[in-house]
Amino acid sequence: MDEDILVVNGSQQGIDLICKALVGKNTVVLAEGPSYSVALHCFQCAGARVVTVPLLADGPDMDAIRAVVDPTPIDFYYTMTNFQCPSNVYWSERKRRQLLALAQEN
């Protein structure tokens, strides 16, 4: 619906608004390393604990994600599946499906 769309000036403004609305002192954010440093800084300034997992040639290290998610419930996963910044990695279809399955389990 139209009321569910928010137009912003750029990614930094969108990330800032997400932080203001969804991120707090006890928020756990999962992200790939390396990742967009401005976003990670914004999450940390909002009080989140950012946990990073290695990024491989075809997407994130799924074993590392499972190792984080099993003992630590995460609130959200900050990622870019197409042309990830700064690595320009493009996730494989297999990694996308694995992440979806993991999200549905948790």
Regions found by a protein language model. Name each.
Residues M1-N106:
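Conserved core of the PLP fold type I
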